[in-house]
């Protein structure tokens, strides 16, 4: 039911947007994110390259925090991404994660923390979202920060890398099937 309501809202908002512009970047944050990005990018006469969702930006921030806590460093020193669909099915891309330019294996040996198990890391990242939800009753702050960061990157054209949801050549990126399949 919630998915249908959110899809209807996306359709209503996109109809309003397309009545006035076709050249403004659009950042979506509404769950189910990948489905709503697909709706916005394929059901309206709007450039697909201007429509993105926050993707796994929030999950990736939680991953960086988890790695930083294990290594006893600042999250700003960690480069790491969660990939896949936002939420419980996202997975950590640890083979390319770094701390201060070191691989996780190098950082583990240098900084003296235990090697990270991908399954445990994934569970910890997902659990951290539930901890926030149960502690505050909502998770609006984190996703708001992720959306603002993405919007600033777009507005400033700063060439930063963000794990977004987007449609390319009619295919939904990451692991989500097309809602029409």
Task: Label every PLM stretch briefly.
Residues 65-172:
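Mobile gating loops/cap/lid regions near enzyme active sites that modulate substrate access
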Residues 16, 43, 150-153, 178:
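Active-site catalytic microenvironments for nucleophilic, acid-base chemistry
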Residues 174-181:
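Conserved small/polar residues in nucleotide/adenosyl-binding loops
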Residues 2-64:
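Rossmann-like NAD(P)(H) cofactor-binding subdomain of soluble oxidoreductases
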């Amino acid at each position: 039911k919630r998915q249908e309501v959110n899809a209807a809202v996306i359709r209503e908002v996109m109809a309003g947007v397309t009545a006035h512009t076709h050249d403004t970047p659009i950042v979506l944050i509404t769950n189910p994110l990948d489905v709503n990005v697909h709706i916005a990018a394929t059901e309206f006469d709007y450039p697909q390259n201007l429509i993105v969702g926050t993707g796994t930006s929030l999950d990736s921030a939680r991953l960086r925090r988890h790695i930083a806590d294990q290594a006893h460093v600042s999250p700003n020193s960690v480069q790491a991404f969660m990939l896949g669909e936002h939420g419980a099915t996202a997975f950590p891309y640890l083979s390319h994660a770094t701390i201060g330019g070191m691989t996780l294996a190098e950082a583990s040996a240098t900084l003296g923390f235990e090697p990270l198990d991908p399954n445990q890391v994934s569970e910890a990242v997902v659990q951290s979202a539930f901890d926030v939800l149960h502690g505050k009753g909502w998770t609006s702050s984190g996703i708001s920060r992720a959306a603002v960061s993405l919007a600033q990157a777009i507005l400033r054209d700063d060439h930063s890398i963000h794990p977004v949801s987007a449609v390319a050549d009619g295919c939904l990126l990451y692991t989500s099937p097309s809602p029409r399949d």
